[in-house]
Every structure is written in structure tokens, then in C-alpha cells.
Amino acid sequence: MFNQGLSLEQAPPIDVPFRFFITAPLFAILISIVILSNDSSLIMNRYSNIAISVVHLFTLGVLSMVIIGAMQQMMPVLAGAVIKRPKIFATIIHLFLSFGTLFFSFYFIFDIKYFLNFATIYLAIGFFSFFIFSMVLLFKVKFVTPTVKAMRIFTIVGIITICLGLYLSMSHINLNITQYHYNIVNIHILFGIFGFALIIIMGVSFQVIPMFYVAKNFPKFIENKLPILLVSCLILFSIIELL
């Protein structure tokens, strides 16, 4: 193995990412409780309240928690984007995401509207704080690698995904389900899976896979163009979906 391009001395304290990593399994346990406590027909119906709760317990409580925790370690080490007060930053993001996810899932389980109000505020603060702050740091990086480019795209797509989620959340709060609501749902899902999750995995793989001698370096075209091509496909799908 080699550490070319890594800034290991800039890694944050281990408890910064670990608080996110430890929280993720707790949400996974909560998912299993919800699944075991409800009829399978509700779980299989993608538009049922229980299914929406389970999906977001995973995407917000497990997937996002792990990605955001890892990003706070990867940004300083892989990109050289140093968070000056990592413990304070991590604490704020972790608290807002944790409580926001709980309120969001509880709204769909118990149908208490105030929970969705709190969830929308908490998740908006948590996600926007993380993505905007990360974007500013990443766009200040001078030595731009394909991984840094992918991280930049990840923050932009993350903001789009959250904006779509906020639109859907506000639709439920205001009881204003428009004719485009389910089209926005489909776009939100694709941006979450192929934008938020896949792009960051792809970007980190550009550096980590060759680093551990799993495979040779990716072709430059793949490293530089594939994330942009993926986002272009997402935008094209969104336009077609709304027509």
C-alpha cells in the first residue's frame, strides 16, 4: 500500500467519524423493529407511511450517517480540505441529523404532524450546514484530483437531493400534493441513490482502489468524465420525468 496524495496528519480525532458510525447500527436496529412490528403488505407498498419511514430510516439514519461521518475523515485526508473545529462541526451535524431522522420516521409511523415540522427544520439545518460548509472547503482546494472533483459534485448533488426532499416534506405539511408530486418523488430517489451515494463511492474509489493494489489506476476519461456523465443523465431524466 502507499499513501501518495494522502494527508494523514490532518485526519480529525477518531471520535469525529465514529459517532456517526456507531449511530448507524442503532438506526438499523430500529428499522428491524419497525419491519417486525408491521404487516408485510405495508412494507412492500412504496407509498405507505410505514414503507416511507423504513426507507428513510435507512437512507438518513444508516447510509447518510455513514457517508457524512466518513466524509469528515476523507475530506482532510484525501482532499486536503481541513475542518478547523471538527468536533464542534461533527457534534452539530450529528445531533441535527439524528433527531431529524427520528422525528421524520416517527411522523410516518405515528402520524403526528408536529414531528414532520421538527424533522424538516432539523434535517434542513443538518444537511445544508454539512453540504454548504463542505462545498466551500472543497472548492478552495488547490491540488484538484479526480476524487476532489467527485467530492465537489457530491456536495452539489447532495444539495439538490435535499431541496427535492424539502419540497416533498413541505407538500405533506401543507397538504398540497400537486400533480407533479410523484414525479418529484422519483427524481428525489434517483438523485439520492445515483447522485448522493454513488458519486461519492465512485470518487473515493478512484484513489482507494489503486492505493490498495486492488486494480490499476482508472482511465483518465473515466475519472474525469464519469461523475459528470452520471449527473447529466440524472438531469436529463428529471426533465423527461417532468414533461
Language model features with spans:
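Hydrophobic alpha-helical transmembrane segments of multi-pass integral membrane proteins
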Residues: M1-L243
